[in-house]
């Protein structure tokens, strides 16, 4: 707790002390908080990075956060229902991706089955853009193994002075889904304030065979953001956000969510142009708390046992960074950051039936879920960018000091690992890259990154819970080594003007990763199943490190812009993983995907037809219960127009041909009386409408 308080005092003291710096009172510009990616600035942009930034312009359908990733090449989603959806990029998922809001704010899920991933704690319509760093190619934003995802909310400082607002409403026919949001903003020379509130109500959807898939949920979100210009070159911003999920069905998990409440608070500070050499100081502090309750009250096994699991997660973190400029061509970033996680929770089981017979007096048992676990990471880093002629070199080094512990162990867990499971690590990450302008319209990027990920809490401390995509109970291992990703990548991007009306652009990337100490799980026949021991599988999986694994793949995009406003585009992504120790792929390896889009993009209207091709996936991990999945093809059509000056209407038909299909990454139906253990099917044909009014 002392460390938590110290982090907040550090941020506050920096803000107060630098606010005393004498500044010119004439406000010629407004200082803005830094973003991970500043598009077009090769001096500061991370190598192999991209940005998707048309969410605010073309809100043409109601969506959950997963939809925000659907058009970014290389992304897929892991689906357990219509709510608990995780992004995956190049076969990296969960903590292998460094997912954040606004450059560093994080909220860690409380549920061991990830019913409440980080992407559920923000209003999707609030996101202005998503920034992606495609590998461990920067050390400035925390420990990064497979890449960075930064979801950026709207910056009020980019608006004109005065009062602004927008109201939006959307509807989907498949699932009778309704979404609403209201946002109000005021911007002046000295301060800005933004408030928003959103409500979402989704019912069960139907797949292409008109089978009803349990997937309903409701959520209410609100947020308040306040920014203040201390001087012309200093800016401070506070952000308060709360989300309340209710009655959430998870068709691919053994339980459902009764409620999921989260609170996220952040404080950001930035000072610019402090001296000729010291160009800036940024500081961030954040706090998040997730309160989650899951039960099996509406599940098939409720008559045999009632299970109720209240769990909590607390995350406290911060960052302090200085930006130095030497000789006008060397940018140096030096700083420190922290990410402190605590989790706890207990499952209470009321056993009503044993050996097929109803008990006259039900038995009550309690199981420790997180065993009062903590995982603290304090990092220090330095990253330099050196520009000479047409080439920018980047080199970075990072040290992470990790401490993990669980203080309330179950007896059987302690009998295996002892009563003291506290572990400490010092992890070294690094990157080296270059970005070269071959010509005025062609860029080459070459990069190496060494990303290190410490084992997460489930991998360390979970005790006989089914937390994977298979039916095994999993046992944590506090002795796990951190996994290492040595990733190499080369990429080209460019554009050319074919004539006065037509243009061509392209991107191509190829990557290869060598994994050391990759964290997986193996069946241990000496450890039997703990709960319901008569069921299969009979034994327990234990998390372990494997010696020999790799990942390779490529991504390709080309786009023809025709007659200025029309376009044809293709995006394709392929990734192949291999676990040589097991003689199979790593789990959750997405299949080859390719999309073909044709559309028009004019100032007052736009339209797009997109053909989505997903291949059969035969590169699977049978030891994790994976089976081959068939390929499929779908067609989406989206239209939008500005009806009046401030009113936008978007309509769409998704899955036009009402296909029945399952993505390879979807979990299988679990604890459902009317479904076998087959992968969750996706929604069938779906008509959507989205209306937005800006003022």
Model-derived regions, located:
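Short acidic/polar hinge/loop motifs at secondary-structure boundaries
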Residues: 106-135
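C-terminal beta-signal and adjacent terminal beta-strands/loops
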Residues: 452, 516-517, 521, 568, ...
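Transmembrane beta-barrel wall of Gram-negative outer-membrane proteins
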Residues: 173-201, 210-246, 257-273, 326-330, ...
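Gram-negative outer-membrane beta-barrel transporters
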Residues: 327-328, 387-389, 402, 505-515, ...
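N-terminal periplasmic accessory domains that precede
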Residues: 35, 65-68, 85-88, 97-100, ...
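Outer membrane beta-barrel strand-and-loop segments of large Gram-negative receptors
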Residues: 223-225, 309-322, 375-379, 475-481, ...
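Flexible loop and strand-edge segments within Gram-negative outer membrane beta-barrel domains
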Residues: 21-22, 202-203, 208-209, 217, ...
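N-terminal periplasmic "start-of-domain" segments of outer-membrane beta-barrel proteins
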Residues: 30-66, 86
């Amino acid at each position: 707790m002392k460390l938590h308080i110290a982090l907040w005092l550090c941020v506050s003291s920096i803000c107060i002390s630098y606010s005393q710096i004498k500044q010119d009172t004439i406000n010629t510009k407004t200082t803005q908080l830094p973003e991970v990616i500043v598009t077009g600035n090769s001096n500061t942009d991370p190598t192999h990075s991209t940005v998707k930034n048309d969410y605010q312009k073309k809100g043409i359908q109601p969506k959950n956060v997963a939809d925000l990733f659907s058009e970014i090449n290389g992304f897929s989603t892991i689906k357990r229902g219509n709510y608990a959806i995780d992004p995956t990029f190049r076969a990296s998922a969960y903590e292998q991706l460094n997912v954040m809001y606004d450059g560093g704010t994080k909220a860690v899920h409380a549920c061991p089955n990830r019913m409440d991933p980080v992407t559920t704690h923000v209003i999707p319509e609030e996101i202005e853009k998503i920034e992606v760093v495609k590998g461990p190619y920067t050390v400035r934003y925390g420990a990064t193994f497979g890449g960075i995802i930064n979801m950026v909310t709207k910056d009020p400082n980019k608006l004109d002075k005065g009062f602004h607002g927008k109201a939006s409403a959307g509807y989907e026919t498949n699932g009778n889904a309704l979404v609403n949001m209201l946002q109000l903003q005021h911007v002046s020379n000295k301060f800005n304030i933004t408030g928003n509130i959103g409500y979402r109500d989704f019912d069960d959807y139907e797949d292409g065979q008109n089978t009803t898939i349990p997937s309903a949920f409701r959520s209410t979100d609100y947020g308040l953001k306040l920014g203040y210009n201390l001087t012309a070159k200093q800016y401070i911003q506070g952000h308060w956000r709360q989300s309340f999920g209710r009655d959430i069905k998870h068709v691919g998990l053994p339980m459902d969510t009764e409620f999921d409440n989260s609170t996220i608070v952040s404080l950001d500070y930035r000072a610019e142009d402090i001296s000729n050499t010291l160009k800036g100081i940024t500081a961030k502090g954040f706090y998040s708390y997730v309160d989650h309750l899951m039960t099996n009250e509406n599940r098939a096994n409720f008559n045999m046992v009632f299970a109720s699991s209240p769990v909590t997660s607390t995350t406290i973190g911060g960052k302090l960074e200085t930006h130095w400029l030497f000789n006008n061509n060397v940018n140096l970033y030096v700083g420190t950051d922290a990410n402190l996680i605590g989790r706890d929770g207990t499952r209470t089981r009321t056993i009503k039936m044993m050996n097929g017979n109803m008990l006259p007096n039900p038995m009550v048992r309690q199981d420790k879920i997180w065993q009062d676990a903590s995982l603290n990471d304090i990092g220090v880093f330095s990253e330099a960018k050196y520009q000479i002629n047409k080439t920018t070199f980047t080199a970075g080094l990072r040290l992470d000091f990790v401490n993990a512990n669980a203080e309330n162990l179950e007896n059987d867990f302690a009998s295996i690992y002892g009563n003291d499971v506290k572990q400490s690590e010092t992890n070294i990450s690094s990157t080296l890259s270059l970005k070269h302008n071959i010509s005025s319209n062609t860029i080459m990027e070459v990069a190496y990154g060494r990303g290190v990920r410490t084992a997460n809490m489930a991998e360390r401390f979970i005790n006989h819970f089914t937390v994977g995509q298979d039916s095994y109970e999993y046992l944590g291992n506090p002795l796990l080594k951190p996994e290492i990703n040595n990733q190499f990548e080369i990429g080209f991007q460019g554009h050319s003007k074919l004539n006065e009306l037509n243009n061509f652009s392209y991107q191509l990337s190829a990557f290869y990763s060598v994994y050391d100490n990759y964290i997986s799980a193996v069946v241990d026949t000496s450890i039997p199943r703990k709960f319901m021991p008569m069921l299969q599988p009979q034994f327990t999986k234990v998390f372990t490190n494997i010696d020999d694994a790799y990942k390779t793949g490529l991504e390709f995009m080309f786009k023809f812009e025709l007659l200025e406003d029309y376009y044809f585009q293709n995006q394709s992504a392929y990734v192949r993983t291999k676990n040589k120790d097991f003689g199979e792929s790593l789990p959750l390896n997405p299949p080859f995907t390719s999309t073909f889009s044709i559309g028009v993009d004019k100032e007052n209207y736009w339209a797009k037809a997109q053909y989505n091709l997903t291949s059969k996936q035969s590169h699977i991990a049978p030891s994790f219960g994976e089976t081959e999945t068939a390929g499929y093809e779908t067609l989406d059509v989206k239209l939008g127009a500005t009806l009046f000056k401030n009113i936008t209407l978007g309509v769409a038909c998704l899955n036009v041909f009402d296909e029945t299909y399952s993505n390879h990454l979807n979990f299988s139906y679990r604890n459902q009386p009317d479904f076998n253990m087959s992968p969750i099917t996706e929604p069938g044909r779906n008509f959507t409408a989205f209306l937005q009014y800006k003022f």
